[in-house]
C-alpha cells in the first residue's frame, strides 16, 4: 500500500523537477542523455548504454544506464576504479565508508548488509577479501523511498552500494558499485522482460 501511495504522489509531481545522481534524471531520452555526457552513449544491449556523465564522481570509472523508448532513463549503475586492498579489505572498506557519508546525509539512514555465508571456508577476518571474491560475503548498503522521504529521493525508489571483485581468483583488489533505480524502473524492467 505504501508503494502505491508513493507512486500516486510521484505521478502528480512533474518529473522534470527531479535532478538525479550524476546530473541525470528519470525519463531522459538518448538526446538529453548525450547532452549530459562527455561522449555519445554507447549501446551495449537490452536498454543498456555505457556513458561518461559530465557530473561524475572521481572514484567511478564507468557508468551503465538503462534507457528505453517508452520509459527513458530508468536505472543507473556506476562502477569504481580498481582499489588495491589488503586481505582484510581495509582500503576498499574505507572508500566504501567515504561514499556512505554523503549518501546518508542526502537520503537518510540506510540498511547495511554484512553477511557471511555459513558454509564458507573464509570465516577469518584475514579472509575478508577471499570471501568477497568467492561470493561468500555480501557487503552492501541500501536505501528505499518511503512516504516520509519521497521528496528527498527526487524520483528514485532505491539506491544500493556494494563491494565486489572482477573475478573469484582476485582478492587483492576490489571495486565499489552503486545503483540508482528511478520510479519508472519497475516498468522499464518489466517491458524488458516481456521481450524474452
Question: Where are the language model's segments positioned?
Answer:
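Non-cytosolic coordination micro-motifs
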Residues: 20-47, 82-196
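Compositionally biased, low-complexity repeat tracts
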Residues: 16-19, 23, 58, 68, ...
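Intrinsically disordered, low-complexity segments enriched in polar/charged residues with Gly/Pro
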Residues: 10, 51-54, 128-130
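Generic marker of residues within folded, mature protein domains
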Residues: 9-11, 66, 133
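Mid-chain, structured segments of secreted extracytoplasmic proteins
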Residues: 56-102
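Sec-dependent N-terminal signal peptides
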Residues: 4-17
